[in-house]
Amino acid sequence: MKFPTVENAALVMIDMQQKLLPAMNDPQTVLELNILLLNAADVLKLDILVTEQYPKGLGNTVPELATWLGEKTPVIAKTSFSVFGSAEFCAELAKRKREVLIFSGIESHVCLLQSVLDAVERGYEVIVASDAVMSRKFSDCHAALEMMRSKGVSVLSTESILFMLLRDAAHPEFKTISKLVK
């Protein structure tokens, strides 16, 4: 496995939208962990890409997350379940020249699963923040995570991913990230 760094990785947050999130099993935890990921990505200067599945019908990214998105963060509308079905997403990702993709968002068994499988097929090193993803039914989420693992995806907690990005307590942002996870 290739360790994620701010130089080689990007966070891909999938479809954390106004009409989707409330339908999830444990939406509050998923929301809080995605806020943590965005906050940490901001501190670490990690590239972020955000998608919205058919925003006309499902709404935009929830305000609690949208406030963390900077001007440089593309929010990409899509209709394909996989982010790789969006030419705009592919173009934005290509500009960033990243090798490692860290995924979070919803729904685990639909858009997230198809995006992750496409990323693996395209040769990316893929990490999924297992506690920052969800489906309406826990069983769907569990099955999707198992499928991802079987394809060589690293399925880790948000906290594990953040400390992998730091690699060392001597990292200049170690104290800041440590405070965020407590």
Please tell me what each predicted stretch does:
Residues 13-14, 48-53:
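Short beta-strand segments at enzyme active-site cores
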Residues 6-9, 25-49:
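A short alpha/beta connector and helix-capping loop motif
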Residues 9-17:
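Active-site gating/metal-coordination segments in enzymes
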Residues 23-27, 138-140:
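Short, solvent-exposed loop/turn segments at secondary-structure boundaries
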Residues 1-10, 43-44, 56-182:
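Active-site-adjacent betaalpha module
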Residues 18-22:
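Short acidic, Gly/Ser-rich segments with clustered Asp/Glu that frequently serve as metal-coordination loops
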